[in-house]
Regions:
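Short, well-ordered beta-strand elements
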Residues: 28-38, 56-62, 129-130
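Sec-dependent N-terminal signal peptides of Gram-positive bacterial secreted proteins and lipoproteins
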Residues: 1-26
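Hydrophobic residues within well-ordered alpha-helices
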Residues: 33, 73-74, 189-191
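Short helix-initiation/N-cap motifs at beta->coil->alpha
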Residues: 61-71, 158-188
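Beta->alpha turn/N-cap motifs
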Residues: 38, 65-66, 76, 80-90, ...
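A conserved helix-loop-strand patch within extracytoplasmic ligand-binding domains
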Residues: 103-152, 255
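Periplasmic-binding protein-like
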Residues: 105-115, 140-147, 206-246, 249-273
Length: 273
């Protein structure tokens, strides 16, 4: 009887250990990633089957703005997000005392200038009005486009990652940059034709049916440091599921798919086999 009791006890203990281990495994193999609708969620949907083969059940939660994804990540509502670039993440952490980190850089979305009135930045008239989103971390990108076109110069020592419109030294056409709009509204403002030119992030341009490489009158170069990334809470970048997610997103096959689908509007960053 004692022997039978011992066997039963051992069996129950082994089963408990198995169930406990299985629960931990399941917790790490199902991840929820918050993302912008395009191209981020589209890219994630593309890699879902591959991740399934890797034992990862990927759930995607789509956000339509740049505010909620980091709040949801910080609150533990999602495991990671995919919508922002490095300067935006740094700025958010600074303003919100956050500890979110970059788990891997995936792609670049060149920011572009669009106009229904003019074919190039150099054709903009004196006293032109340009609409820009209120994302402070993108101001340097906008300024560089206008600087490269010879329309403005910047004060000595200006760093693009922290630049604002107050850093403009000379503005030979007296261009007014109105930067009070939510990023997601920029395509509608472009369609309204209110301004002489409108600056739009490529994800919102693509969502609106625009083709950045064809429709933009000025487009950020591939060498831009503003790579879109997978963000996680500090420490989670070491989770096996997150590592697998980043590896699949940076694989050559995924990046080939990105190049073919977006035709230069979205540019892969680096690659892994």
């Amino acid at each position: 009887m004692k022997k039978l009791t011992g066997i039963l006890t051992a069996t129950i203990a082994a089963a408990a250990l198995f169930l406990g281990a299985n629960t931990v495994a399941n917790a790490d193999t199902t991840i929820t990633v918050g993302a912008s609708a395009a191209p981020h969620a589209e890219i994630l949907r593309h890699v879902q089957p591959q991740l399934k083969k890797e034992g990862i059940n990927l759930k995607i939660k789509v956000f339509d703005d740049y505010i909620m994804p980091n709040k949801a990540l910080a609150n533990g509502e999602i495991d990671a997000n995919y919508f922002q670039h490095i300067p935006f993440l740094k700025d958010w952490n600074k303003k919100n005392h956050g500890t979110l980190v970059d788990a891997g850089d995936i792609h670049l979305e060149p920011i572009g200038v669009y106009s229904k009135k003019y074919k190039s930045l150099k054709k903009l008239p004196k006293n032109a009005k340009v609409y820009v989103s209120s994302n402070v971390s993108d101001y340097g990108r906008v300024l560089k486009l206008f600087k490269d076109a010879g329309l403005i110069t910047l004060k000595k020592g200006t760093k693009l990652e922290t630049a604002t419109f107050n850093d403009i030294k000379t503005n030979k056409k007296n261009i007014t940059f109105k930067h009070t709009f939510e990023a997601k509204l920029m395509p509608k403002l472009y369609e309204s034709n209110e301004a002489d030119a409108t600056v739009i992030n490529s994800n919102y341009a693509v969502q609106a049916g625009l083709k950045p490489t064809k429709d933009a009158i000025a487009l950020e170069k591939k060498s831009s440091p503003y790579a879109n990334l997978i963000a996680v809470q500090k420490g989670d970048q070491k989770r096996p599921a997150i590592k697998k997610l980043v590896k699949v997103l940076k694989s050559k096959s995924t990046q080939k798919w990105i190049n073919n689908k977006y035709n230069g509007a979205v540019l892969p960053v680096g690659s892994q086999k």
